[in-house]
Amino acid sequence: MAKPACVFLPPAFLEATRAIMPADLSMDDFIAACQRPLRRSLRVNTLKISVTDFLTLVQDYDWRLEPIPWCAEGFWIERGDEELRLGSAAEHLSGLFYIQEASSMLPVSALFAGAEAPSRVLDVAAAPGSKTTQIAALMNNQGGIVANEYSASRVKVLHANISRCGVKNVALTHFDGRVFGAALPESFDAILLDAPCSGEGVVRKDPDAMSNWSPESVTAIADTQRELIDSAFHALAPGGVMVYSTCTLNAQENQQIVNGLLATYGDAVSIEPLGDLFPGAKQALTAEGFLHVFPQIYDSEGFFVARLRKHHSVPPLAKPSYKLGKFPFTPLSGKDSAEIAQAAAASGLAWDKTSRLWARDKEIWLFPAELEALVNKIRFSRIGLKLAERFTKGYRWQHEAVIALAVADGKQRFELDATLAQEWFHGRDLYPEPPPQTDECIVTYQQQPLGIAKRIGSRIKNNLPRELVRDGVLDFHQ
């Protein structure tokens, strides 16, 4: 458990929070919860491993895992050795789990509540990727997700996390989220708008989160949120579901934003109450059916979640005036696609018909078929994953493709022990005894793919991308 930090709570914030605090909750408990260290939590990445198999894998570790009630894959975690970063664990490096705050698992759980099975999803404010990867896992890498991030620097982090988790059904965009209603009207059957906010709920993680807080800043942020939710609603197809969420507590950024949408669009939209989302949800349920999570309720961050249903079309927004430019990819023929799939299978890689091959010069990419209809409607930073580069003598398979597409029973797999796996993540060449029998192999640890490598004599040449190389001590439970 992290050491307590002195959390700054502005007097005006405390006064505003006191005014909206439910009668069955106490301000003293709220302030005490804000001053306590935040419990660490993780979410098992079921694209890589089942929850049952994960629990079996780590059962001998000095980890105490407590299930998170609203996410079947989520657990609070306490470890015997807190000195080693959880992010340095072998299971994190290989994508078996994502370090994610418990409350932030709520919006995606709400999006997929009941029998909801969307095929095309928009994540309006996606970085760093916790919710995008959670969505991808619940979709089992099928369908398609447009993951948008306005901050250029955070797009790289978003891609890194998607790649580590073996996600293949995502397209990345880099826009102000207010463009989607005009650019892609009625194009998604589910939308997550985890809106930028004043961050009142995250003080346990960031003691200085409120240092720039003011009533004026809340008003300015709420203005943006109103525009974002309106745009997202236009991008939602009739019959579709949208979740609006924030990690803040005030009504101006939460209830008032949703109620404003209801007032604008009348019977085109309705609230779907979340009181039955999980056992104990009613402790945070508002009269309208939203979840308003104060940190003392579940000993978590503060959060707000609303689930909305669109019932029919609304008048469209003006079409955007931007120019897209020429799309640089072309779809591959059936013959070319079959040849590449055969070569990939020989190297231990495979995919299904929900992905299709496109080319840009010598690059071969694997696009989610569900998102092909959006090509030439909006500019993408990247779609799907880069599968290979084509050369005269064959193909050079790419790291992200190996992580997402390696088959479990491939003959080219070469299992490393803990010592060699750490060397791999440190970016060093390996000298296993005996060496692999094939010139090219997919190196694995705990049966999970770590990357692709070439055998040169008795040496395995390390091809781990430089940005993934780790320095320092790693936690491999030898």
From Swiss-Prot:
<dbReference type="InterPro" id="IPR027391">
    <property type="entry name" value="Nol1_Nop2_Fmu_2"/>
</dbReference>
<feature type="binding site">
    <location>
        <position position="176"/>
    </location>
    <ligand>
        <name>S-adenosyl-L-methionine</name>
    </ligand>
</feature>
<dbReference type="InterPro" id="IPR001678">
    <property type="entry name" value="MeTrfase_RsmB-F_NOP2_dom"/>
</dbReference>
<dbReference type="InterPro" id="IPR049560">
    <property type="entry name" value="MeTrfase_RsmB-F_NOP2_cat"/>
</dbReference>
<feature type="binding site">
    <location>
        <begin position="125"/>
        <end position="131"/>
    </location>
    <ligand>
        <name>S-adenosyl-L-methionine</name>
    </ligand>
</feature>
<protein>
    <recommendedName>
        <fullName>Ribosomal RNA small subunit methyltransferase F</fullName>
        <ecNumber>2.1.1.178</ecNumber>
    </recommendedName>
</protein>
<dbReference type="Pfam" id="PF13636">
    <property type="entry name" value="Methyltranf_PUA"/>
</dbReference>
<dbReference type="GO" id="GO:0070475">
    <property type="term" value="P:rRNA base methylation"/>
</dbReference>
<comment type="similarity">
    <text>Belongs to the class I-like SAM-binding methyltransferase superfamily. RsmB/NOP family.</text>
</comment>
<feature type="active site" description="Nucleophile">
    <location>
        <position position="247"/>
    </location>
</feature>
<dbReference type="InterPro" id="IPR023267">
    <property type="entry name" value="RCMT"/>
</dbReference>
<dbReference type="GO" id="GO:0005737">
    <property type="term" value="C:cytoplasm"/>
</dbReference>
<dbReference type="Pfam" id="PF17125">
    <property type="entry name" value="Methyltr_RsmF_N"/>
</dbReference>
<feature type="binding site">
    <location>
        <position position="194"/>
    </location>
    <ligand>
        <name>S-adenosyl-L-methionine</name>
    </ligand>
</feature>
<keyword id="KW-0489">Methyltransferase</keyword>
<dbReference type="InterPro" id="IPR029063">
    <property type="entry name" value="SAM-dependent_MTases_sf"/>
</dbReference>
<dbReference type="InterPro" id="IPR018314">
    <property type="entry name" value="RsmB/NOL1/NOP2-like_CS"/>
</dbReference>
<dbReference type="InterPro" id="IPR048457">
    <property type="entry name" value="YebU_pre-PUA_dom"/>
</dbReference>
<dbReference type="GO" id="GO:0003723">
    <property type="term" value="F:RNA binding"/>
</dbReference>
<dbReference type="Pfam" id="PF21150">
    <property type="entry name" value="YebU_pre-PUA_dom"/>
</dbReference>
<dbReference type="InterPro" id="IPR011023">
    <property type="entry name" value="Nop2p"/>
</dbReference>
<dbReference type="Pfam" id="PF01189">
    <property type="entry name" value="Methyltr_RsmB-F"/>
</dbReference>
<dbReference type="InterPro" id="IPR031341">
    <property type="entry name" value="Methyltr_RsmF_N"/>
</dbReference>
<keyword id="KW-0694">RNA-binding</keyword>
<keyword id="KW-0949">S-adenosyl-L-methionine</keyword>
<keyword id="KW-0963">Cytoplasm</keyword>
<dbReference type="InterPro" id="IPR023545">
    <property type="entry name" value="rRNA_ssu_MeTfrase_F"/>
</dbReference>
<feature type="binding site">
    <location>
        <position position="149"/>
    </location>
    <ligand>
        <name>S-adenosyl-L-methionine</name>
    </ligand>
</feature>
<comment type="function">
    <text>Specifically methylates the cytosine at position 1407 (m5C1407) of 16S rRNA.</text>
</comment>
<keyword id="KW-0698">rRNA processing</keyword>
<keyword id="KW-0808">Transferase</keyword>
<dbReference type="GO" id="GO:0009383">
    <property type="term" value="F:rRNA (cytosine-C5-)-methyltransferase activity"/>
</dbReference>
